Amino acid sequence: MKSFTGTTQKCTVCEKTVYLVDKLVANQRVYHKACFRCHHCNSTLKLSNFNSFDGVVYCRHHFDQLFKRTGSLEKSFDGTPKFKPERTFSQETQSANRLSSFFEGTRDKCNACAKIVYPIERVKVDGTAYHRACFKCCHGGCTISPSNYIAHEGRLYCKHHHIQLFKKKGNYSQLEVEETVAAPAESETQNTETQNAETQNADTQNADTQNTETQNGSV
């Protein structure tokens, strides 16, 4: 146990003592192996697959998603992110909290899946937010964009399917409803044709009767 008595290093995350058997050092900071996690998704990190911003560590996927694609924040791509040794732990915590507040403040929910939509993946039309992956035609799953979609009764359609389902029918009733209404209409047509045929037969019989009476009178 003597090998542990002189250990006074504290974990950057939990501030508890780190023993040699559980120690991990990254960017001159000491962590418990279990505390070395992505600040965004909490997944366990390794020295070979992390990035950091202002001393806060992220998995590469979320670092790329949150910072690299925006091009607006300082970033590092070589696996050994930039480190400012003069910053204290409290300053780093404040910086991390500011970043967390920035992303946690995004409360837009996707109208399709009801999950949070971050600015980098957001499509917004008529004040309604969607994930890019969720912004598609509800009928055929076609890819659409804010410039080529049609919204009808709160649902999104590509122009092709909207015309196919609604405009060609001459009104905005659902296709299924129109098909249901069409069946009685066909029955009414058949009834009308039957009545016309019966009327013609009656007229023919009357004409034959009149001709017979005329012939009898002549005799």
From Swiss-Prot:
Segments of skewed composition (Polar residues): 203-219
From the UniProt record, give one GO term of the biological process aspect: actin filament bundle assembly
Q: What CDD domains does its record include?
A: LIM2_SF3 (cd09441)
Which tissues carry this protein?
Pollen.
> What keywords is this UniProt entry annotated with?
LIM domain, Metal-binding, Repeat, Zinc
Spell out the coiled coil positions from the record: none
Domain of life, per lineage: Eukaryota
In alphabetical order, the GO MF annotations are: actin filament binding; metal ion binding
Segments of this protein annotated with the region Disordered: 181-219
Q: What does this protein do?
A: Could possibly involved in controlling pollen-specific processes such as male gamete maturation, pollen tube formation, or even fertilization.
Protein name, UniProt field:
Pollen-specific protein SF3
Source organism per entry reads Helianthus annuus
